[in-house]
């Protein structure tokens, strides 16, 4: 048996996900742009946004209809947007608990994703209480060096770029140019482009930034899997949970998702609960 490598659904080698914070009124236009190009993402909302919508902000009706019905995800961003790194653990626990509780009660959904409200996050104490609070992934505010790698530490998920990064479009070109037919690294490793930011950063005549990005990256369904953060997490988790026989001639998929991978230069799809010969 040669090396096995993950493929995104449909045997794609590339995936794109977006992550936007704070739930401001400018999310309206951002969602419209993303939808127009078939791009999906996760919107990280502080709990206070849904418990007491601000005057001049998104209304209760908009909060209910803007995200999930359009195929996007809502994730935890604390309750009051407190930075856990400069908070006592007990305050951090309360902040994340209340933030998750508020979102779940408002949307009537189980919400397990998160974005840290502040700075690069690698603190093990914080990660420990996030696990206890049922958070399965948390996006950090670091990275931004053009990496297309799938995270190993889901509670320190480093993005590819922020939407104000001057190299964002350069990274997009590199991502699109990676050809699995001619590039060994692109053929071996599935690629993930992760863009994050705040929709209010486009408000001063800068909407062209995200419009150009989405126009370039969208509409490539045969090549790119467009997914929310949680969809990425759940799919990779399902792939990593595959069970192989000792001689690598059989594989069992215990998850509820179909999983795609390549081995011996052949493509394999293993359905939910299915055992296949290789």
Ranges and model annotations:
Residues 1-28:
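Boundary/entry segment of secreted carbohydrate-active catalytic domains
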Residues 2-8, 51, 104, 137-148, ...:
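C-terminal domain-boundary segment and adjacent tail
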Residues 5, 29-33, 125-129, 209-213:
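A short acidic, amphipathic alpha-helical/loop segment
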Residues 17, 73, 224:
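Hydrophobic "anchor" residues on beta-strands that sit immediately upstream
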Residues 20-23, 78, 199, 229:
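Active-site metal-binding loops of divalent metal-dependent hydrolases
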Residues 35-128, 132-136, 142-161, 191-199:
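Metal-dependent polysaccharide deacetylase catalytic core of the NodB/CE4 family, i.e.
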Residues 170-186:
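A short, acidic, amphipathic alpha-helical segment used as a generic capping/interface helix at domain edges
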């Amino acid at each position: 048996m040669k090396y096995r490598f993950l493929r995104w659904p449909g045997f794609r080698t590339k995936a794109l996900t977006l992550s936007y914070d704070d739930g401001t009124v400018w999310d309206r236009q951002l969602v419209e742009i993303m939808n127009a190009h078939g791009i999906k993402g996760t919107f990280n909302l502080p709990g206070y946004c849904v418990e007491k919508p601000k005057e001049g902000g998104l209304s209760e009706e908009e909060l209910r209809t803007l995200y999930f019905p359009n195929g996007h995800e809502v994730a935890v961003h604390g309750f009051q947007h407190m930075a856990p790194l400069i908070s006592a653990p007990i305050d951090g626990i309360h902040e994340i608990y209340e933030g998750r509780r508020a979102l779940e009660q408002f949307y009537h959904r189980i919400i397990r994703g998160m974005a840290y409200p502040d700075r690069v996050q690698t603190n093990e104490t914080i990660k420990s209480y996030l696990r206890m609070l049922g958070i399965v992934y948390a996006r950090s505010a670091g990275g931004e060096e053009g990496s297309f790698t799938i995270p190993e530490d889901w509670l320190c998920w480093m993005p590819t770029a922020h939407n104000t990064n001057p190299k964002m479009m350069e990274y997009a070109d590199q991502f699109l140019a990676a050809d699995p037919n001619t590039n060994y690294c692109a053929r071996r490793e599935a690629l993930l482009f992760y863009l994050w930011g705040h929709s209010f950063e486009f408000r001063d005549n800068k909407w062209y930034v995200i419009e150009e990005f989405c126009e370039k990256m969208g509409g490539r369904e045969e090549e790119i899997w467009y997914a929310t953060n949680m969809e990425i997490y759940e799919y990779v988790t399902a792939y990593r949970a595959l069970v192989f026989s000792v001689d690598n001639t059989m594989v069992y998929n215990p998850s509820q998702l179909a999983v795609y991978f390549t081995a011996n230069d052949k493509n394999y799809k293993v359905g939910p609960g299915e055992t296949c010969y290789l």
